[in-house]
């Protein structure tokens, strides 16, 4: 407890204390003796001895000092004083340090020392209140009135409980009052050795306490001193006291600060920064959102000065805007082109140049290789809001390009192209490119002349983009509608190792070849072969169908129109069979159809298990029709199967009408059906409803794989 009394030793002068009230005059002799001792020992200390002896007075006074230093009403040091005789009444004057002159030095009735409250002047009213008291006089007045009422109730020194409750009520005011009182907080220690130690400590803290030596007057100036003093006292007492009450007071101070004016808050922050409450931050953020900054302009300057504008890209952004303007103007001036204005973008990576006439603009577009500050600039017409439709009309999409082709190689083929953009993914070419021309007429001319041109052994296909491309036949080159003469073949049963290059060697007249791949970059087992005319497609169908490619006999058929409801109803030489049992083999499938020449079951490449569907080939469409009629509603290995004409990607893939009716597994899905336990015939062991769960049932078995969709 010795270290706690050092905080305000050098603050205060006995001459400045208020005249004592009537209660103090009764013990005037004792007070005069204490004043003489104070003048002899240290001109700044005020020690009032107790009647029982100098040492006892110092002890009781020391206990009293701790109370105002630690918020007074925290009910910690003041209550400790009640343990020893003669100190019980000391808590009362310690509390009354926050009252006006009336209670400045009210001693206890039992003769205890008045707790060195003599220095508290009327001007202390402003300093004895927390930060909010300095800002708002109403709070100070309210607390003063409460203190006066408490003085009357505290005349009975034996009622300790009432005193503690009253102290808790005015706790915020008392805490700051004790912090601001100049010399009333310092007393001698219990013995002379403690006094010497305290003097040494006070010399170290003189620099910190100089700001508190003058008694603060009413107003905001007192509030500036409060946070510093309170902070120093709190730091000294953290070692011995519990700070829970102090934290509560700090929270109350923060809430009060939120309600004060911003100007008053700024004054306090100049003296001691105070932690902002969360509510205050939210208010500031709301103000910032309410007044957002104006959006930055993308281009410095105003609207174009003329209608003849030129976009300039790839500028050296390390240069300032004025330097770029001067450099661009000089470059065009060297080419006898007068520049009206130059507007630089905010990023300084691009800009716009305004010319006087369309002739100057056209001449500028013809310039190439111009450099500004070491960067070769890019010149083109600005892209307006309505220019996308125009660009699409003069842009072609080239497919089936070699993956290693470069822009320079394409430039040799498309000499009239204004811009060539190769499409790539993850740094790898996708075999397609966009070819943009200066005019729509150039695009149409190239479309007719370059369709099917070979590049590195691959025949390229050209397509329109935009609205023209929507009316164009899928993979069909020119605009057309379905007339029953498709130019595209669908190739199935393709080896997974086959590539587009392999198919190009087989189908030499093909203009476009696509082998769909999965996410791992592997073939899905089918392909699309496009030709320049229906005759070429028909010829390839007759000559290459069932040819072996890398160990597998391929199947070819003409592609019907996409989305046609009757596409699957067209007969062919191949039947599509779904609803197969997991145990059905290709031999069993082939034997189930009279006249069949080949059968294949689609399996999962990872697990090798059947996907529940397959294909059966015949020598002619007539044989296929007969087999289809014979096996309609038939069963294979106990499963009822569904038959249809083989057709790649239609309105719902192989999953029936829109993928409904159970997908691959018959009506309602799964493996059910009427089939029995075994055999090919109808009925079998289980009769209708069968062993595995009847119509639509999947029983206890897992579904038969994923639906395969063609692209």
Curated annotation (Swiss-Prot):
Q: Which domain of life is it from?
A: Eukaryota
Q: Name one GO molecular function term.
A: telomeric DNA binding
Q: Where are the sequence repeats?
A: 58-65, 75-82, 83-90, 91-98, 99-104, 105-112, 120-127, 128-135
Q: Where is the composition biased (Basic and acidic residues)?
A: 274-301, 698-711
Report the residues modified as Asymmetric dimethylarginine. 657, 661, 667, 671, 674, 680, 682, 688, 692, 695
List where in the cell it is found: Nucleus, Nucleolus; Cytoplasm
Query: What GO CC terms are in its UniProt record?
Result: cytoplasm; nucleolus; ribonucleoprotein complex
Concerning InterPro entries, the annotation shows:
Nucleolin_RRM1, Nucleolin_RRM2, Nucleolin_RRM3, Nucleolin_RRM4, Nucleotide-bd_a/b_plait_sf, RBD_domain_sf, RRM_dom, RRM_dom_euk
Which residues, renumbered to this chain, carry the PTM Phosphothreonine? 69, 76, 84, 92, 99, 106, 113, 121, 215, 302, 368, 406
UniProt biased composition (Low complexity)? 56-107, 122-137
UniProt region (8 X 8 AA tandem repeats of X-T-P-X-K-K-X-X), positions on chain = 58-135
Glycyl lysine isopeptide (Lys-Gly) (interchain with G-Cter in SUMO2) cross-link, chain position(s): 298, 325, 371, 378, 514, 578, 590, 625
**Sequence ranges assigned to domain RRM in this UniProt record:** 308-384, 394-467, 487-561, 573-648
Gly residues: bias regions: 651-697
Residue span of region Disordered: 1-304, 641-711
Q: Which UniProt keywords apply?
A: Acetylation, Cytoplasm, DNA-binding, Isopeptide bond, Methylation, Nucleus, Phosphoprotein, Repeat, RNA-binding, Ubl conjugation
Q: How is it modified after translation?
A: Some glutamate residues are glycylated by TTLL8. This modification occurs exclusively on glutamate residues and results in a glycine chain on the gamma-carboxyl group. Symmetrically methylated by PRMT5.
Modification sites for Phosphoserine: 28, 34, 41-42, 67, 145, 153, 184, 207, 357, 459, 461, 564, 581, 592, 620
Q: Which Pfam families match?
A: RRM_1
Question: Omega-N-methylarginine: which positions carry it?
Answer: 695
Give residues for the crosslink Glycyl lysine isopeptide (Lys-Gly) (interchain with G-Cter in SUMO1): 298, 325, 590
What's the subunit arrangement here? Identified in a IGF2BP1-dependent mRNP granule complex containing untranslated mRNAs. Component of the SWAP complex that consists of NPM1, NCL/nucleolin, PARP1 and SWAP70. Component of a complex which is at least composed of HTATSF1/Tat-SF1, the P-TEFb complex components CDK9 and CCNT1, RNA polymerase II, SUPT5H, and NCL/nucleolin. Interacts with AICDA. Interacts with APTX. Interacts with C1QBP. Interacts with ERBB4. Interacts (via C-terminus) with FMR1 isoform 6 (via N-terminus). Interacts with GZF1; this interaction is important for nucleolar localization of GZF1. Interacts with NSUN2.
| Record's function text | Nucleolin is the major nucleolar protein of growing eukaryotic cells. It is found associated with intranucleolar chromatin and pre-ribosomal particles. It induces chromatin decondensation by binding to histone H1. It is thought to play a role in pre-rRNA transcription and ribosome assembly. May play a role in the process of transcriptional elongation. Binds RNA oligonucleotides with 5'-UUAGGG-3' repeats more tightly than the telomeric single-stranded DNA 5'-TTAGGG-3' repeats.
- State the PANTHER family in the record: EUKARYOTIC TRANSLATION INITIATION FACTOR 4B/4H, NUCLEAR RNA-BINDING PROTEIN SART-3
Q: What is this protein called?
A: Nucleolin
Which species is listed as the source? Macaca fascicularis (Crab-eating macaque)
């Amino acid at each position: 407890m010795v270290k706690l009394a050092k905080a305000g030793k050098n603050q205060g002068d006995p001459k400045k204390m208020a005249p004592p009230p009537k209660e103090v005059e009764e013990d005037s002799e004792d007070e005069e003796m204490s004043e003489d001792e104070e003048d002899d020992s240290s001109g700044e200390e005020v020690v009032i001895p107790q009647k029982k002896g100098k040492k006892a007075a110092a002890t009781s006074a020391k206990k009293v000092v701790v109370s105002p230093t630690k918020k007074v009403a925290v009910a910690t040091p003041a209550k400790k004083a009640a343990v020893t005789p003669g100190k019980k009444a000391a808590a009362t004057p310690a509390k009354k340090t926050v009252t006006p002159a009336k209670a400045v030095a009210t001693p206890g009735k039992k003769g205890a020392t008045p707790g060195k409250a003599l220095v508290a002047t009327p001007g202390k009213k402003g300093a004895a209140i927390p930060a909010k008291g300095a800002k708002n006089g109403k709070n100070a007045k309210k607390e003063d009135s409460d203190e006066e009422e408490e003085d009357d109730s505290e005349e009975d020194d034996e009622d300790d409980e009432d005193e503690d409750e009253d102290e808790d009520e005015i706790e915020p005011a008392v805490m700051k009052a004790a912090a601001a009182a100049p010399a009333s907080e310092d007393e001698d220690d219990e013995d002379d050795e403690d006094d010497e130690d305290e003097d040494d400590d006070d010399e170290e803290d003189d620099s910190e306490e100089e700001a508190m030596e003058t008694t603060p007057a009413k107003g905001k100036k007192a509030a500036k001193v409060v946070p510093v003093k309170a902070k120093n006292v709190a730091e000294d007492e953290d070692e011995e006291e519990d700070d829970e009450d102090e934290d509560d007071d700090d929270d109350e101070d923060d809430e009060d600060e939120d309600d004060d004016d911003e100007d008053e808050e700024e004054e306090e922050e100049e003296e001691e920064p105070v932690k902002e409450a969360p509510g205050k931050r939210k208010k500031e953020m709301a103000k910032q959102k309410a007044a957002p900054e104006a959006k930055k302009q993308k281009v410095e300057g105003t609207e174009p000065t003329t209608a003849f504008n030129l976009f300039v890209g790839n500028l050296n952004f390390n240069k300032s805007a004025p330097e770029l303007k001067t450099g661009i103007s000089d470059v065009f001036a060297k080419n006898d082109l007068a520049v009206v204005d130059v507007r630089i973008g905010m990023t300084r990576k691009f800009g716009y140049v305004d010319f006087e006439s369309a002739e100057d603009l056209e001449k500028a577009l013809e310039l190439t290789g111009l450099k500004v500050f070491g960067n070769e600039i890019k010149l083109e017409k600005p892209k307006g809001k309505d220019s996308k439709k125009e660009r699409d009309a003069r842009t072609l999409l080239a497919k089936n390009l070699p993956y290693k082709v470069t822009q320079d190689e394409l430039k040799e083929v498309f000499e009239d192209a204004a811009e060539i953009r190769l499409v790539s993914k993850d740094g790898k070419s996708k075999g397609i490119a966009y070819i943009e021309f200066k005019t729509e007429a150039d695009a149409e001319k190239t479309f007719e002349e370059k369709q099917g041109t070979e590049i590195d052994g691959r025949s390229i296909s050209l397509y329109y983009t935009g609205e023209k491309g929507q009316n164009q036949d899928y993979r069909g080159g020119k605009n057309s509608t379905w007339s029953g003469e498709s130019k595209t073949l669908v190739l199935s049963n393709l080896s997974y190792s086959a590539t587009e290059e392999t198919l190009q060697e087989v189908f030499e007249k093909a203009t476009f070849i696509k082998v769909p791949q999965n996410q791992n970059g592997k073939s899905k087992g089918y392909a699309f072969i496009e030709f320049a005319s229906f005759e070429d497609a028909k010829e390839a169908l007759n000559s290459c169908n069932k040819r072996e490619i890398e160990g597998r006999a391929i199947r070819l058929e003409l592609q019907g129109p996409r989305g046609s409801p009757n596409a699957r109803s067209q007969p062919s030489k191949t039947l599509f069979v779904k609803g197969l049992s997991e145990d059905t083999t290709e031999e069993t499938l082939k034997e189930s159809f009279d006249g069949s020449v080949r059968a294949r079951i689609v399996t999962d490449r990872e697990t090798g298990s059947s996907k529940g569907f397959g294909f059966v080939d015949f020598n002619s469409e007539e044989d296929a029709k007969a087999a289809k009629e014979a096996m309609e509603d038939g069963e294979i290995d106990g499963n009822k199967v569904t038959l249809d004409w083989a057709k790649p990607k239609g309105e719902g893939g192989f999953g029936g009408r829109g993928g409904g009716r159970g997908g691959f597994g018959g009506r309602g899905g799964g493996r059910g059906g009427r089939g029995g336990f075994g055999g090919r015939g109808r009925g079998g062991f289980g009769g209708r409803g069968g062993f595995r769960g009847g119509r639509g049932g999947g029983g206890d078995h897992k579904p038969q794989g994923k639906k395969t969709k063609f692209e």
